[in-house]
């Protein structure tokens, strides 16, 4: 066994600056923050419940490295933190999961078996403060991916799973479904050239009628086509939107998109999931190739969940969604998911009995009853346990409330 010399730093020693002085801990970079125990417990309890739900649907867990090779073609390449290792290789901190999942599938499951259902959870880092699921530069996601299959049933499964995940958190959410290819097909069917379509995509995505009119005049778009473009920006609402979209669909691609969404809607209804549709979604969704969706809840104007269908390298179909843990935990009702009560245990035997009964237990460090009572009240611990008996903390007579082994 190696002997530790007096010059070796102890594992619990304070970090030292180059001059031997303790490092300052008073400041943090913009976009990161400390997470205190109450929030941590709430977030991690939610993470555990979501992971268990995904497992119950057949989604097996994988873990992915936080460090990746920097890739200029990465969808978040311009937003990723980059660093150089000792060999001069440029690395990047993980900035999203779908690309990493694609690499994992290609490396470890090139032949399936498909469909492949995977779940993940962990931190992401973004150099900028904008992302689909958070304004922080360091944040947590839990997600699910369904790889190797496509079609109505696969899309409906993910929508139903997303709905179940939000229900696990006890929130009332609206699932908004889009299909970016519908707008692209409508613009193509209108006979507009590529550069004009590119300019119009952005205006439609922002639902800017003024910009649409300006671009239409600049590029000589006919009044009839301009009216159709305005109609695209208004395709938001319940299933009646699909009826309106059928009228605007003048080509095969647009018609196929509407029929697919109609079939997905019917399948989702069978699963008890109600959908809203936003068919004016255009280029907001990067690499997605089919159906897309987001979930919104009252009290926050950013989505707590987002996902859609995409193609992995080699054309393998995939679809999935990610949940922003910080956002969902922030709007989750108190006590949902339910958490076990934590009690103050006066000895090891009491702690063991409490934990065996499904309670959390903190072990007393002193025999001073007044000090323990003060601590329990400050921590919000309602009861303490001695032997196999749970006792109220507040009453002076410590009246027995119940028994652990009852």
UniProtKB/Swiss-Prot annotation:
Alphabetical list of InterPro entries matching this protein: aa-tRNA-synth_II/BPL/LPL, HisRS-like_core, HisRS/HisZ, HisZ
Main localization category: cytoplasm
A GO cellular component entry from the record: cytoplasm
Keyword Zinc: no
Keyword annotations from UniProtKB, A to Z: Amino-acid biosynthesis, Cytoplasm, Histidine biosynthesis
Localisation per UniProt entry: Cytoplasm
GO MF annotation: an example: histidine-tRNA ligase activity
GO annotation terms (biological process): histidyl-tRNA aminoacylation; L-histidine biosynthetic process
Domain of life: Bacteria
Gene3D superfamilies linked to this entry: Bira Bifunctional Protein, Domain 2
Annotated pathway: Amino-acid biosynthesis; L-histidine biosynthesis; L-histidine from 5-phospho-alpha-D-ribose 1-diphosphate: step 1/9
PANTHER family for the chain: HISTIDINE--TRNA LIGASE, MITOCHONDRIAL-RELATED, HISTIDYL-TRNA SYNTHETASE
Protein family membership: Belongs to the class-II aminoacyl-tRNA synthetase family. HisZ subfamily.
HAMAP family found in the cross-reference section: HisZ (MF_00125)
Other comment: This function is generally fulfilled by the C-terminal part of HisG, which is missing in some bacteria such as this one.
Subunit structure: Heteromultimer composed of HisG and HisZ subunits.
Known role: Required for the first step of histidine biosynthesis. May allow the feedback regulation of ATP phosphoribosyltransferase activity by histidine.
Protein name: ATP phosphoribosyltransferase regulatory subunit
Gene source species: Deinococcus radiodurans (strain ATCC 13939 / DSM 20539 / JCM 16871 / CCUG 27074 / LMG 4051 / NBRC 15346 / NCIMB 9279 / VKM B-1422 / R1)
Native organism taxonomy: Bacteria, Thermotogati, Deinococcota, Deinococci, Deinococcales
């Amino acid at each position: 066994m190696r002997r530790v010399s007096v010059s070796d730093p102890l594992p619990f020693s304070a970090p030292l600056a180059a001059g031997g002085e303790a490092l300052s801990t008073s400041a943090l970079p913009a976009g990161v923050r400390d997470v205190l125990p109450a929030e941590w417990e709430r977030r991690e309890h939610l993470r555990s419940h979501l992971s268990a739900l995904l497992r119950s649907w057949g989604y097996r867990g994988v873990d992915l490295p936080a460090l990746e090779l920097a890739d200029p073609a990465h969808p978040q390449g311009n937003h990723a933190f980059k660093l150089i290792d000792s060999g001069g290789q440029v690395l990047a901190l993980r900035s999203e999961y779908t690309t990493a999942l694609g690499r994992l599938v290609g490396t470890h499951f090139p032949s399936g078996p498909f469909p492949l259902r995977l779940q993940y959870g962990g931190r992401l880092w973004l150099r900028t403060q904008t992302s689909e699921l958070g304004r922080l530069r360091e944040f947590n996601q839990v997600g699910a991916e369904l790889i190797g299959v496509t079609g109505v049933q696969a899309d409906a499964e993910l929508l139903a799973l997303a709905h179940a995940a939000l229900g696990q958190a006890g929130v009332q959410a609206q699932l908004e479904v889009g299909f970016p290819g519908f707008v692209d097909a409508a613009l193509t069917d209108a006979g507009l050239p590529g550069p004009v379509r590119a300019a119009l995509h952005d205006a439609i995505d922002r639902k800017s009628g003024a910009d649409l009119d300006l671009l239409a005049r600049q590029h000589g778009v006919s009044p009839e086509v301009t009216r159709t473009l305005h109609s695209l920006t208004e395709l938001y609402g319940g299933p009646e939107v699909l009826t309106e979209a059928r009228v605007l669909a003048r080509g095969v691609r647009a018609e196929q998109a509407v029929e697919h969404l109609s079939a997905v809607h019917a399948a989702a209804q069978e699963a008890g999931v109600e959908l809203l549709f936003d068919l004016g979604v255009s280029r907001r969704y990067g690499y997605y190739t089919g159906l897309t969706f987001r979930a919104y809840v009252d009290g926050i104007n950013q989505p707590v969940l987002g996902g859609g269908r995409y193609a992995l390298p080699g054309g393998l179909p995939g679809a999935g969604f990610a949940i922003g843990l910080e956002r969902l935990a922030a709007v989750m009702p108190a006590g949902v998911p339910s958490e076990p009560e934590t009690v103050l245990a006066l000895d090891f035997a009491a702690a063991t009995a409490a934990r065996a009964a499904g309670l959390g237990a903190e072990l007393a460090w002193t025999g001073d009853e007044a000090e323990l009572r003060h601590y329990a009240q400050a921590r919000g611990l309602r009861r303490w346990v001695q032997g196999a008996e749970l006792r109220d903390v507040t009453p002076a007579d410590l009246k027995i409330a119940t028994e652990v082994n009852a």
